[in-house]
Amino acid sequence: MSFIKEFREFAMRGNVVDLAVGVIIGAAFGKIVSSLVADIIMPPLGLLIGGIDFKQFAFTLREAQGDIPAVVMHYGVFIQNVFDFVIVAFAIFVAIKLINRLNRKKAEEPAAPPAPSKEEVLLGEIRDLLKEQNNRS
């Protein structure tokens, strides 16, 4: 089997394609969540606590000196990333909870009893014949 053919079979297997789709959708979902946090949640939250823009929260470790830029820790951006994480984690939690509930409902449905085997059918016929013989006597 050639290398290219093996690679094609690997790349087109169902679980690899599903994984690729999941990664692409996850990246798009991450952008949506980042926008939700940065553009929708943080502005009203900052307004509620006094018109604060969290992106501006920073701690300067060293001031700029000539051509050397300042060394700054932007902890406001970190706060936004924490909000991003919490929202993504909550969304995943809710999705998994729904999937588990659906799987539980499927598991609770009683399965149809299996069809009797040939031996069971023959034993049933023998039993019925013996009952008939006992009833005649």
UniProtKB/Swiss-Prot annotation:
Transmembrane regions listed in the UniProt entry: 10-30, 76-96
The processes (GO biological process) annotated in the record are: monoatomic ion transport
- Its chief place of residence is membrane
Range of residues in the leader sequence? none
Keyword Transferase appears in the UniProt entry: no
Domain of life of the source:
Bacteria
Which Pfam family, just one, is annotated for this protein? Answer: MscL
**UniProt keyword terms in alphabetical order:** Cell inner membrane, Cell membrane, Ion channel, Ion transport, Membrane, Transmembrane, Transmembrane helix, Transport
Q: Where in or outside the cell is it found?
A: Cell inner membrane
So what does this one do?
Channel that opens in response to stretch forces in the membrane lipid bilayer. May participate in the regulation of osmotic pressure changes within the cell.
Q: What name does the UniProt record give this protein? A: Large-conductance mechanosensitive channel
Q: What organism, scientifically named, is this protein from?
A: Salmonella typhimurium (strain LT2 / SGSC1412 / ATCC 700720)
Which gene carries the instructions for this protein?
Answer: mscL
